From Swiss-Prot:
This is UPF0434 protein ESA_02427. GO terms for cellular component: cytosol. Belongs to the UPF0434 family. InterPro entries: Trm112-like. Transmembrane segments: none annotated. HAMAP family: UPF0434 (MF_01187).
């Protein structure tokens, strides 16, 4: 994931900052507790494609 891209994209739900989880290849919105997938290196920033983060993932 290009760090320059991370600086300009935002969560489609709350417009908050997204964090890249390299291990899971997901963009994380901590505010909404959502994880957006990457497909072929392209972020899929659709709310219906996101998965809810588990309690363990939000409180490491």
């Amino acid at each position: 994931m290009d760090h320059r891209l991370l600086e300009i994209i935002a969560c489609p739900v709350c417009n908050g900052k997204l964090y890249f989880n390299q291990e899971k290849q997901e963009l994380i919105c901590k505010a909404d507790r959502l994880a957006f997938p990457l497909r072929d290196g392209i972020p899929v920033l659709l709310e219906n494609e996101a998965r809810a983060l588990t309690a363990e993932e939000t409180n490491p």
